[in-house]
Amino acid sequence: MASAKPKKKNPRLASGRKRVRQDTKLNAANTSLRSKYRTAVKNVEKAVLAGDKTKASELFAKAQSIVDTVADKGIFHKNKAARDKSRLSAKVKALALAPEKAAA
């Protein structure tokens, strides 16, 4: 696990103190969203590995929304979000087409 950062000195100016409060809240929000993003992607990949088509497509739809939200808020770059969505989509699509190719 990551070790705790050393405590910084408290700012003297009121604007500095306010900035510290804001940064703490934003850091918590960004950490939470980043965690949701990673969890959503992992859940889709698990469903694909398990071979569950319906669950994978449902989870992919939810993951798309989360990925877009994270990109809009600037937590991850929009190109990274697009790349991850594209890769997940390809995995879900390959899962959906797999039995048809095996039967043909």
From Swiss-Prot:
Biased composition annotated in UniProt, kind: Basic residues: 1-20
Annotated segments matching region Disordered: 1-34
Gene3D superfamilies given in the database record: Ribosomal protein S20
InterPro entries tied to this protein: Ribosomal_bS20, Ribosomal_bS20_sf
Nucleotidyltransferase listed as a keyword: no
HAMAP family membership: Ribosomal_bS20 (MF_00500)
Family: Belongs to the bacterial ribosomal protein bS20 family.
PANTHER family per UniProt: 30S RIBOSOMAL PROTEIN S20, SMALL RIBOSOMAL SUBUNIT PROTEIN BS20C
Protein name: Small ribosomal subunit protein bS20
Organism: Variovorax paradoxus (strain S110)
